[in-house]
Regions:
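Acidic/polar-rich alpha-helix caps and helix-coil junctions
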Residues: 1-196
């Protein structure tokens, strides 16, 4: 990654696709009427180094919070009750599942078309992918990872594709530590993940 071991004064968010802003709460975005500041000493969502202090509500070790599928109009969850709706499946997942089935049946054009419906829908408006074969499957894996982020699919997808033992061994969690307007790409917890 171009971020590994580097720092920058330029926020990295502008170069990311629209689904990032719909999925993640990050420094400078608005959440529940507040501009979030996920930096060291930040006022709304402050950064906290891993195990530097005991858990503190409203702090982050990655520089990010989850936004996807949350309703900003609802009050914060207290205890074990919430009025937040549970989303079990979305139409985008149905299209991606069908695209993968088409790929497995060597129906390349149908697979491309289905994935591109997800990429080209209103609010996302990304250009279509025209790859085929193994290149298409790599594009598809990335598309699924982004589109279905934090919906509970990736771990099981990786197992189903028999790639978990490759991708998840010696894997590390990364994030951004923002100090005085400088963005630093960091290891969040300094631990290599091991997959059995």
């Amino acid at each position: 990654s171009e971020w590994h071991g580097t720092t920058t004064k330029e926020p990295p968010y502008d170069q990311l696709e629209p689904r990032f802003a719909a999925t993640i709460i990050y420094r400078g975005c608005t959440w529940k009427g507040r501009v979030m500041d996920c930096s060291v000493g930040g006022t709304n969502g402050a950064f906290m180094a891993y195990r530097e202090q005991s858990y503190s509500y409203g702090k982050t070790t990655t520089g990010y919070f989850l936004r996807k599928l949350l309703d900003e109009k609802l009050i914060d969850v207290k205890g074990t009750k919430s009025s937040q709706a549970w989303v079990e499946i979305r139409f985008a997942e149905v299209l991606l599942n069908k695209a993968e089935a088409a790929y497995r049946l060597n129906k390349t054009t149908e697979a491309q078309s289905l994935m591109n419906r997800v990429r080209g829908r209103q609010g996302v408006n990304l250009p279509g992918k025209s790859s085929s074969g193994e290149a298409w499957f790599n594009d598809y894996r990335n598309e699924r990872k982004i589109e279905l982020a934090y919906e509970g699919h990736l771990f099981w997808d990786m197992r189903r594709w028999r790639l978990a033992h490759i991708e998840y061994n010696n894997y590390r969690c990364h994030g951004l530590k923002i100090t005085n307007g400088t963005y630093e790409y960091i290891d969040c917890d300094g631990q290599d993940r091991k997959f059995p």
